[in-house]
Swiss-Prot record:
Domain CIDE-N: 33-110
SMART domains: CAD (SM00266)
Gene Ontology annotations for the cellular component aspect, listed alphabetically: COPI-coated vesicle; COPII vesicle coat; endoplasmic reticulum; endoplasmic reticulum membrane; Golgi apparatus; lipid droplet
Subcellular location: Lipid droplet; Endoplasmic reticulum membrane; Golgi apparatus; Cytoplasmic vesicle, COPI-coated vesicle
Family: Belongs to the CIDE family.
Its membrane topology: Peripheral membrane protein
Protein's recorded name: Lipid transferase CIDEB
């Protein structure tokens, strides 16, 4: 009882809060961020790539190779040039966010109006309004993927957006799926052959029984 009476309530509360913070930190660090799709381009918007990354640094490393860049890189939002300089800000970005990667000495510039994206070079009429805009991004999650993944994003009247992400498969997964389909096909074919053979057997037995009855019938 004397030991309990000597305990300081504030120190006890501090110890409990520290234990809770340590436990929360361990739970948070045990779950790594997932791979998410992004679209990146260079400062002139002439080259665009679809990449997947879990962290800001991973996206910069992949953009360095995909866009053939060099030196220190800066990541900004393509829409308004906001710098993505922290991992916390990067994790708040939505999937399929359009980002621009700048080399040292380069700066963000707004998109020129009247020109369609992806460098089609076709000018729209001055007073026209977009009805729908569809973007296609083909990317690989792994260099060993046989077919790339496809991301499709459609925006209608600038208000409603719809996106679809079709994941590609590697050689092992494709072979596994082909074997599974072949197994199911052969299994179905086997059941069909068994049904046909059973039907033929019943037909033959019925014919023989009819012939036997015909022989035994008195004239």
């Amino acid at each position: 009882m004397e030991y309990l009476s000597n305990l300081d309530p504030s120190s006890l509360l501090r110890s409990v809060s520290n234990m809770s913070a340590d436990l929360g930190r361990k739970v948070w660090t045990s779950a790594p961020p997932r791979q998410r799709p992004f679209r990146v381009c260079d400062n002139k918007r002439t080259t665009r790539k679809g990449l997947t990354a879990a962290t800001r640094q991973e996206l910069l490393d992949k953009a360095l190779e995909a866009l053939v860049l060099s030196g220190a890189l800066t990541l900004v939002l393509e829409e308004d040039g906001t710098t993505v300089e922290s991992e916390e800000f990067f994790q708040l970005l939505e999937d399929d966010t359009c980002l621009m990667v700048l080399e040292l000495g380069q700066s963000w510039s707004p998109r020129r109006s009247g020109v369609l994206s992806y460098g089609l070079g076709q000018e729209k009429p001055k007073h026209s309004k977009d009805i729908a805009r569809i973007t296609f991004d083909v990317y690989k999650q792994s260099p060993r993927d046989l077919f790339g993944s496809l991301n499709i994003k459609a925006t209608f009247y600038g208000l409603y957006s719809l996106s679809c992400d079709i994941q590609g498969l590697g050689p092992k997964k494709i072979l596994r799926e082909l074997l599974r389909w072949a197994s199911s096909l052969l299994q179905g074919l086997g059941h069909m052959l068994l049904g046909i053979s059973s039907t033929l057997r019943r037909a033959v037995e019925g014919t023989e029984r009819w012939q036997r009855q015909g022989r035994l019938k008195p004239y």
